[in-house]
Amino acid sequence: MKEKNKEPLFHIVKRDALPWYKSLGIRFLAILLALILCGIITTITTGINPLQVYQSIVLGAFGSVRKTWVTFQNIAILLLIALALTPAFKMKFWNIGAEGQVLAGGLAAAACMICLGDKLPNAVVILCMIVASLAAGAIWGFIPAFFKAKWNTNETLSTLMMNYIATQLVAFYTIVWEVPKGSGKIGIINQNTNVGWLPQIFGSKYLLSIVVAVVITIFMYVYLNYSKQGYEISVVGESENTAKYVGIKVEKVIIRTMLLSGALCGLVGLLLVGGINHTVTTTIAGGQGFTAVLVSWMSKFNPLTMVFSSFLIIFMDRGASEISTNFGLNHSYSDILTGIILFFIIGCEFFITYRLQFRKKAEKEEQ
C-alpha cells in the first residue's frame, strides 16, 4: 500500500506585528536566559556563586563613576556607528565597511594632528581634522556606492574589502609616524602641546561623544522619517523599480546615502582619535563596526530603539570583561560570555518575527 506523507509536527509561520510590550518581553526573557546560562557556565568553570557573577556584570558597567562614564562613552560610539549604517541598511545597501570608514576618518584626523600640529593654531587644526575625517569617511563610502550604482557590484564584498585596505593604510602610517622609532606604534599624539585634542565639555573628556551621539540620533530620526531624502531611501529599499517609476534617481540616492553613512563613520574616527585615544591604531574601532550591524538590525532601523540596543550590548560586554578580570580568567573567556549573550539576543528576534504552529493531532499511519 502506498505510504502517505506524514505532516510535519509544526510549521514556522510569520507573525503579525507584535505589540511593543510583547517584543520587549521576549527580549527580556532572552537576556534573562543568557544571564542564567553565563552564570551556570562560570560556576561550573570556577566554582563561584552565580550571584557573584551577576554582581560583577553590574559592577563592570557601573561599579564606579569612571566605569559609568566609560560605559556611556562606549554606548555613544557604538550608537553613532549604528546610526551611520542605518540609512544604507534601510535602502537595502548592505554596508559592512563601517570599520574601514571609521579607520579612514581616524587616520585623516591623526594626519592633521601630526602634520599640522606645529604649523597652525589649535582651532584651525581641529577644523582641518573635522573636514578631513568627514571627507575620508565619505570617500570610503563613496567608492563601493559608485561601483554599485554604475555596475551593480556586490556591496557586501566591496565594503568588506575596503576594511582591509583601511587597516593596511593605518598599519603603514603607524610605521611612518612611529614614536619612538622601532616601537611599532605612534603613541600619544601631541602629548605636550595637546594640539588637535578635541575640547572637553564641563571639564569631562567623556561628554563630547555622548552629546554628539544625542544630536546625531535626533538628526537621523528626523532625516529618515520626515525628510524627502529619507522617503526616497525607504522607497528605494522597498523596490528599486517602484522608485524608478515614480521618478526617483536610484543611483543618486545610493551615492548620496553612502556619502552620509561614510561621513558619519569618519566622524566616529575623529572622536576616537581626537577626543578619546589621541592616537591611531589598526584596532581603534575595536570591532564595533561589525557589532553596530547587529544594533541597527535588532532595532529595525529605528534610531531611537538603537539607544536601548547599544546600551544592552555595551552593558553585557563590560560585565563580561569584569567577570574575566575578577575571577582570574583571560579575556577570551569574556568573549565567550559576550558571544553567548549576543546569540540569545539574535535568537530572540526569530521568535519576535515568527511563531511555531504545531499540528493539532497526529495523522494515523496507514499500514
Question: Where are the regions a protein language model picked out?
Answer:
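Cytosolic-side transmembrane-helix boundaries in multi-pass membrane proteins
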Residues: 1-31, 44, 238, 245-252, ...
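Membrane-interfacial amphipathic/re-entrant helices at transmembrane-helix boundaries
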Residues: 2-3, 10-80
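Short loop segments and helix-boundary regions at transmembrane helix junctions
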Residues: 17-25, 89-97, 121-188, 226, ...
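Single transmembrane alpha-helix segments in multi-pass membrane proteins
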Residues: 42-46, 56-116, 134, 138-153, ...
